[in-house]
Curated annotation (Swiss-Prot):
Keywords: Cytoplasm, DNA-binding, Endonuclease, Hydrolase, Nuclease. One of its GO terms (cellular component) is cytoplasm. Its EC number is 3.1.-.-. It comes from Frankia alni (strain DSM 45986 / CECT 9034 / ACN14a). Cleaves both 3' and 5' ssDNA extremities of branched DNA structures. It is an enzyme of class 3 (hydrolase). NCBIfam families: PRK03298.1. This is Endonuclease NucS. It is found in: Cytoplasm. InterPro entries: Endonuclease_NucS, NucS_C, NucS_N, NucS_N_sf, tRNA_endonuc-like_dom_sf.
Length: 220
């Protein structure tokens, strides 16, 4: 991970345009290729970001970060206050809470509760940056990665997106790999981001699954 604290301005050019005027900010460049711009506020939320895969071109005082859709973050560095890189290694990830862990077991047994025709290939399929909860096959024979959450939020969409980048590079799998976020509830923001990323969402009923009753998911 690279940490850069700098006085900078940031311009986003894509489906719309956005400008952050000059200020001191933290620029995070992660090993997965993502770049995010942070202020000293907003908790964990960045002011702007670019999800992987993307290409970073460093010129004299200017970074150009371009994703596969040709959207760009242009970071103009006026003064660098700190610049360091750190090897964090492979993170073991958060342990799932009891409900999420049980949901994974139940949905592994009944993947068709996520989407009709879905069958399980493997639980906890390793991606190199953490295991995706379920690796499945749909009725068309395509590979589907399922990430399971108690509540589906933007973080879950981002996590699934990172996994898909790795899975699409896995020579052992048929490509492309499709992604579905499965949860008891999914926020509107997460639904919107998932749709933008080409991901599916499935709302599943934990109580019905525990009772072995038919579960009717909502697909988006």
């Amino acid at each position: 991970m690279r940490l850069v604290i700098a006085r900078c301005s940031v311009d986003y050019v894509g489906r719309l345009t956005a400008h952050l005027p000059s200020a001191v900010r933290l620029v995070l460049v992660k090993a997965d290729g993502s770049v995010s711009i942070h202020a000293d506020g907003r908790a964990y939320k960045p002011l702007n970001w670019m999800s992987p895969p993307c290409v970073i071109a460093e010129e004299s005082g200017v970074w150009r970060v371009t994703n596969k859709a040709a959207e760009q973050l242009v970071i103009t560095l006026e003064e660098i206050l700190h610049d360091s890189s750190h090897e964090l290694g492979v993170d073991p990830g958060l342990r799932k809470d009891g409900v999420e862990a049980h949901l994974q077991v139940l949905l592994a047994d009944r993947p068709d509760a996520i989407a009709p025709g879905l069958t399980l290939i493997r639980r906890e399929y390793e991606t190199g940056i953490g295991p995706v909860d379920l690796l499945c096959r749909d009725s068309d024979g395509s590979t589907v990665a399922v990430e399971i959450k108690r509540k589906g939020e933007i973080d879950g969409v981002e996590q699934l997106t990172r996994y898909l980048v790795r899975l699409d590079a896995d020579p052992a799998l048929p490509h492309p790999v499709r992604g579905i976020l499965a949860a008891q509830s999914i926020t509107p923001q997460a639904r919107l981001l998932a749709a933008d990323r080409g991901l599916g969402c499935a709302v599943v009923d934990y109580d019905e699954l525990r009772g072995l009753e038919p579960s009717i998911p909502t697909l988006f």
